[in-house]
Amino acid sequence: MRLATDLETPRRVAVLSVHTSPLAQPGTGDAGGMNVYVLQTALQLARRGVEVEVFTRATSSADAPVVPVAPGVLVRNVVAGPFEGLDKNDLPTQLCAFTAGVLRAEATHEPGYYDVVHSHYWLSGQVGWLARDRWAVPLVHTAHTLAAVKNAALAAGDAPEPPLRAVGEQQVVDEADRLIVNTEVEAQQLVSLHNADRSRIDVVHPGVDLDVFTPGSRDAARAVFGLPTDQKIVAFVGRIQPLKAPDILLRAAAKLPGVRVLIAGGPSGSGLAQPDTLVRLADELGISDRVTFLPPQSREQLVNVYRAADLVAVPSYSESFGLVAVEAQACGTPVVAAAVGGLPVAVADGVSGALVDGHDIGDWADTISEVLDREPAALSRASAEHAAQFSWAHTVDALLASYSRAMSDYRARHPRPAARRSGRRFSMRRGVRT
C-alpha cells in the first residue's frame, strides 16, 4: 500500500477557469459557487506553499493581463474573442484562442514549470486536455455540473444544455487523470452517465470561510438593509435563473402571511432574458410589500444577509453541492433545501434545517413554517456546528492528496528525466525568476 507520506506535493498548479473569473462578483452573470471555489482553494494552496496561476477569459479591455491576488496566487486574463456579449454557449468557438494564450504564457517559463493542470467545468477541461499533453503533467478535472444531470431536472422556462456540452464532458472524463467531485452522489453520476472509472474519482467537499461566515446579531444585520425586526425573514441568495428556483420561495411565501422574503442576486442564464420576472411574480402573488430585492452582495455584506434571515431557502432543481447552504449555516442560520444533488450533504436534515422532496408549493410552505417554529437558539447552534466541518482547509487537504495521486500515477505511466523538474524557480510574488 502506498502511504500518503510517500506522495509528492506539487510546487505549482495551473488552474483553468475559462468561462468565469474567480475575481467576479458571485451572483452576477455566470459567477457563482465555482468562482468562490476556485479563489478560495487557490488561496489555501498558496498558504501551503503551492503556487497557483489561474487562467480565465478576459471580459473587459480594462482587465489587466496579470493580476496578483495574494502571495503565490496570480490570475491571468487571456484574450479570447470579444470582451462582451459572448454567451457561455458560444465559448467553444474561442477555445482555440484561449488555449493558445495559455500555452504562450507557459512558454515564458522554464520547461516543467507546472506540476498539475486543474480544470474547472467542461470548457476548461478541453483546454486542460491539450495542456496536459503539451506539458506532460497530469490533468485533474472538476466538472462542477453535468449536462445530463441538469437536463434531467429542468425547471419550467429553462433552456436545456446543448448536445455539444455532453459530448465535450464525455471527452474530458475519458482524458482526465483524476476527477474531483463534491459528493459521492456526483461520483456515481459520473460512473453511470459517463462510464467513469471510480478508482480515478476523488470526493472533495467544498468549504466555507469560517473566519468570515460566523454567527452575529440578527437585529444589527437587519439594520444594514433597513429590514424590520418583528417579522420572520426567509432569504434566497444566488443567481436569478429557473435552475435556482427562487419562484418556488415566492409562491410558498404567499401561503405564509407575515413571512418576509429577502432575495439577493442578479439574473443569469435563462434569467437574463427577463430580469424582472420575480418582481412581476411578487406583484401577481400580492406579496410585493413583503419582498425585498438586493443586488449581488460582497462577502462582507453577504454575511449580513445570512444573519438577517431566520432561514435560508435553497430550492434548486439541481445543485452539485450548495455553497450558499453551508455559508448560511456557518452564520447560524438554518436552511430548507431541495433534496437534490449534494444538498443532502450540505444540509443535515432535521438538525441544521430540512430537506424537501420535489417542488410542491404546499410542501415547501409547510416545511418552511415548521422550521421557523423550532427553537431558534438550538437550531442556530446546530447549524453552525454542522457547517464547521466544511472548511476550505479541509477541502485543500483532500485536493492536495488528489494532486499527489495524479502526479504519482502519471509519473508511473510516463517516466521522464528528473531534469524536467529542475531549473530556476519563478516567484509569482515578484513576477521574476530566481
Swiss-Prot record:
NCBIfam families: mycothiol_MshA (TIGR03449). PANTHER family: D-INOSITOL 3-PHOSPHATE GLYCOSYLTRANSFERASE, GLYCOSYLTRANSFERASE. Belongs to the glycosyltransferase group 1 family. MshA subfamily. UDP-N-acetyl-alpha-D-glucosamine binds at Q25, P26, G33, R239, K244, Q297, E319, E327. Keywords: Glycosyltransferase, Magnesium, Metal-binding, Transferase. CDD domains: GT4_sucrose_synthase (cd03800). It comes from the Bacteria. The gene is mshA. GO terms for biological process: mycothiol biosynthetic process. InterPro entries: Glyco_trans_1 (IPR001296), Glyco_trans_4-like_N (IPR028098), Mycothiol_biosynthesis_MshA (IPR017814). Residues 414-434 are annotated as: Disordered. HAMAP family: MshA. Its EC number is 2.4.1.250. It holds the Pfam family Glycos_transf_1. Transmembrane segments: none annotated. Catalyzes the transfer of a N-acetyl-glucosamine moiety to 1D-myo-inositol 3-phosphate to produce 1D-myo-inositol 2-acetamido-2-deoxy-glucopyranoside 3-phosphate in the mycothiol biosynthesis pathway. It catalyses: 1D-myo-inositol 3-phosphate + UDP-N-acetyl-alpha-D-glucosamine = 1D-myo-inositol 2-acetamido-2-deoxy-alpha-D-glucopyranoside 3-phosphate + UDP + H(+). This is D-inositol 3-phosphate glycosyltransferase. GO terms for molecular function: acetylglucosaminyltransferase activity; D-inositol-3-phosphate glycosyltransferase activity; magnesium ion binding. Homodimer. Mg(2+) binds at Y306, R307, A309, T333. 1D-myo-inositol 3-phosphate binds at H19, D30, A31, G32, G33, M34, N35, K88, Y121, T145, R165.
